């Protein structure tokens, strides 16, 4: 179904990761000051005691720890523990539902980042040719290298997005993002494991790091949380989307709003509308941001100057790419208009949909440059994405040109004619 519409919709498989969850409970209402006890004994479900799915849970917590339930919706203070039970007092109460996520503030569970279940899901992704993996609770770069080695052995061309949601990941941010193909700011668990006032600063930092390495970055969790139950968002949620867009996120993501919310389509429309409006109101700088990690690279120089030209002349950019690299470089500089990225590789088309400002389009390339240019312009005219008489900036750069064997680089401006 993802490929049934003219829009390019990529598929990302989100691994479950090493989550610690409570078992099934009779939905008790936890009240401040009452005793409540997680236990590693299986099948326990009473008003004051519930099983957890992690055998080392008792060993991981110490007296004085704060347990956060369901992303911090409720909290428990650890008072004492036995060999199989943690005795707690409720600090912030609420209704406890079955299979809620448990975090220890400031700590991560000593579990492998990729569980046995995750490996099964990853194999499913290989068999079904998903476009991205989102790997949960990544603590260091080792797990990214491990997954990439597995994908290499499987001959699977799938990119790895790391979810930054663990306290242990923060000291290793640079190496984790460097090893990955992109990052997701998963603010729910990040705000549970770290003080919540740190989350906006970390969001900005992660976006900045990804930009410097020319990796895509997604901002996720609680963006339109109120729309799970209500048809309109809070004004703070609207501002949250706008801030993520202004900070330079490549994508913003919904989860509970569309997974089990009452208004999934409305939530998507709100997010889409706010993101577009925010982008349209952003000031256009003729000179793009400073060059990034590959500033000595010929391709980066061309992307930089193509962006200056497009912004100065107020034109969209058309790029022809086999590998996607030039489209990625152009996206890094965030030109004011759309980047139409033509590629003759389906996998590249799917991958480029994640990058900010890029509209990927599949098209077979001709060995003749003029024929290729003309076909691309006609296709955009037919789709209503260009109008006759406007100008476009054409970019072709790289060691794998689209119409001959030797390396070629050029930028040109053309007037669209039918």
Swiss-Prot record:
Gene Ontology MF terms in the entry: ATP binding; kinase activity; magnesium ion binding; potassium ion binding; pyruvate kinase activity
Subcellular location: Plastid, Chloroplast
Pathway: Carbohydrate degradation; glycolysis; pyruvate from D-glyceraldehyde 3-phosphate: step 5/5
Chief location of this protein within or outside the cell: plastid
Highest taxon above the source species: Eukaryota
Keyword entries, A-Z: ATP-binding, Chloroplast, Glycolysis, Kinase, Magnesium, Metal-binding, Nucleotide-binding, Plastid, Pyruvate, Transferase
InterPro entries in the cross-refs: Pyr_Knase, Pyrv/PenolPyrv_kinase-like_dom, Pyrv_kinase-like_dom_sf, Pyrv_Knase-like_insert_dom_sf, Pyrv_Knase_AS, Pyrv_Knase_brl, Pyrv_Knase_C, Pyrv_Knase_C_sf
Example of a GO cellular component annotation carried by this entry: chloroplast
UniProt-annotated binding residues for substrate: 188-189, 221
EC number in record: 2.7.1.40
Cofactor entry: Mg(2+); K(+)
Catalytic function, reaction form: pyruvate + ATP = phosphoenolpyruvate + ADP + H(+)
Residue ranges the record marks as coiled coil: none
Annotated site residues (Transition state stabilizer) in this chain: 163
Tissue: Expressed in developing and germinating endosperm and in roots.
Residues the record lists as binding ATP: 21
Binding-site residues for K(+), renumbered to this chain: 14-15
Residues at which Mg(2+) binds: 165, 189
Transmembrane segments: none
One protein family per Pfam: PK
UniProt-listed PANTHER family: PYRUVATE KINASE
Family: Belongs to the pyruvate kinase family.
NCBIfam families reported in the protein's UniProt record: pyruv_kin (TIGR01064)
Protein's name in the database: Pyruvate kinase isozyme G, chloroplastic
């Amino acid at each position: 179904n993802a490929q049934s519409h003219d829009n390019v919709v990529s598929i990302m498989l989100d691994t479950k990761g090493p989550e610690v969850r409570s078992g099934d409970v009779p939905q008790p209402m936890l009240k401040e000051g009452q005793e409540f006890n997680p236990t590693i004994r299986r099948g326990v479900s009473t008003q004051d005691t519930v099983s957890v799915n992690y055998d080392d849970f008792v060993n991981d917590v110490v007296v004085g720890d704060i347990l956060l339930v369901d992303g911090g919706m409720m909290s428990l203070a650890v008072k004492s523990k036995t060999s199989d039970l943690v005795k707690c007092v409720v600090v912030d109460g609420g209704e406890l539902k079955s299979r809620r996520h448990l975090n220890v503030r400031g700590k991560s569970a000593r579990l492998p980042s990729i569980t046995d279940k995750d490996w099964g899901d990853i194999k499913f992704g290989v068999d079904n040719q998903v476009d991205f993996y989102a790997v949960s609770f990544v603590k260091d770069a080792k797990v990214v290298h491990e997954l990439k080695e597995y994908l290499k052995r499987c001959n699977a061309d799938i990119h790895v997005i790391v979810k930054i949601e663990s306290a242990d990941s923060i000291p290793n941010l640079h190496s984790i993002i460097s090893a990955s193909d992109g990052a997701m700011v998963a603010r729910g668990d990040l705000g549970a494991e770290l003080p919540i006032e740190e989350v906006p600063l970390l969001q900005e930092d992660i976006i900045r790091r990804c930009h410097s390495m020319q990796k895509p970055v997604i901002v996720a969790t609680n963006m339109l949380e109120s729309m799970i139950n209500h048809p309109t968002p809070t004004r703070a949620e609207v501002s949250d989307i706008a801030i993520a867009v202004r900070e330079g996120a490549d994508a913003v993501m919904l989860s509970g709003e569309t997974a089990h919310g009452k208004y999934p389509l409305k939530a998507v429309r709100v997010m889409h509308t706010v993101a577009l409006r925010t982008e349209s109101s952003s000031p256009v700088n003729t000179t793009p941001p400073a060059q990034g990690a590959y500033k000595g690279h010929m391709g980066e120089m061309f992307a930089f100057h193509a962006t200056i030209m497009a912004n100065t002349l107020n034109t969209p950019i058309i790029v022809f790419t086999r590998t996607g690299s030039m489209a990625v470089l152009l996206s890094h500089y965030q030109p004011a208009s759309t980047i139409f990225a033509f590629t003759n590789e389906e996998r590249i088309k799917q991958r480029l949909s994640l990058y900010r400002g890029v509209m990927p389009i599949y098209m077979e390339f001709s060995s003749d440059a003029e024929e290729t240019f003309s076909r691309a312009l006609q296709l955009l005219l037919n789709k209503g994405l260009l109008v006759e008489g406007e100008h476009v900036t054409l970019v072709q750069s790289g060691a794998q040109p689209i119409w001959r064997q030797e390396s070629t680089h050029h930028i040109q401006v053309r007037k669209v004619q039918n």
